Amino acid sequence: MRFLQALAATFLLFFCMYFLEGTVQISDRFMRFEIELFKAAELALMRIAIDLYTLLPIIVGLAALAMSFLWFRSSEMVAVRSAGISALAAMCVPALCAFLFGIVSIALLNPLVAILTDQFRISAGKIDASLVQSEWIRNGEVVLGRPGQKSESVIRATLVDETKFEFQDADIFLFADDGTLTHWILAETAMLEDSRWQLSNGKIWRIDSDSPNPEKSAVEFEEYELPTDLTRDQVNSSLISLNFVSFWEIEKLIELRERAGISSVEFKVFYSAELAKPLLFAALVLVGAGFTTRPARVGPASIKVLLAALTVLGIYYFSTFTKVLAENERISPFAAAWLPPTVALALALTQLLVVEDG
């Protein structure tokens, strides 16, 4: 119970700091749109969800540190050990609570964060259209120009309707087999349909040695169909950001991206890290206990708290570092996810066993 109280207090502290900061930043960012304070607070609430979720390991570690320090100051741990209960056994319940909280975070909080983050993107985009990012899509093989001539194309456009796969301000670049640019298509709107892009209100420039002046041979159109081998599933999987994906959808998305020939390393790393999160939370609780339950003769309490806090931060940044290595394919996603909690658990058990030895 003490751990849950410390966890709630620590989370509330971080929430208040990030909420106030986010409200001020959003009010300043959308000042020219004369946004109301209530609307700024609503956007801040949606925006900070991903930040707080990312910082959960630090929040859990600091909560465990606060709980253990209170035990140390009130001599509760001394009484527990005098009753014949080891420090390791006394920390089993808080560690189990942290483990269960890790399960709840990936099962319930993760989908909620994905919904709030996506809602922030939509709401902010309605206020300021410049916040809507352009997307780059590799279009596969298309036929354009001379019969039998195939080109590789890349599309840059702004997604405006996810359900209809409708884009605005589309720039389409077509390349020959040797990588040289052959055509440039500019369209006001582009909609992905069955085996084709339906383009509207645009212009086609032919760029090759046969047309030294592309503007002279340029052709304007109201409607144009550009063949493609892309499917809506492939485009959807390539556009999705991890911030908008629920934990329960990641496996399906990984399979979809691999079938479409799109790299899914980042998604595999995230999925493995989420699976390892309960163990990481439990290990961080034991790390906090390992420093603060040592006898008073070992050193001042302030030094113990500082060392414990630095250790928690070190484990967090080590976890981030291993994820970066995995995303760059230096180590496997499994190693990146499970190495930090394993190291943290080994360190915590070492500390607690030293305490038991006296």
Please tell me what each predicted stretch does.
Residues 198-199, 211-212, 235, 239:
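Short acidic, Gly/Pro-enriched loop/turn segments at secondary-structure junctions
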Residues 144-193, 199-202:
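Structural signature for solvent-exposed beta-strand/loop edge elements and short helix-capping sites
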Residues 215-228:
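Generic detection of short hydrophobic beta-strand segments and adjacent strand-loop junctions
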Residues 197-198, 338:
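Signature tryptophan residues that serve as conserved aromatic anchors
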Residues 163, 205-207, 212-213:
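Short, surface-exposed beta-strand-loop junctions and turns on beta-sheet-rich folds
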Residues 1-150, 162, 228-358:
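Transmembrane alpha-helices
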Residues 180, 225, 320:
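Residue-level signal for pocket-adjacent positions within structured domains
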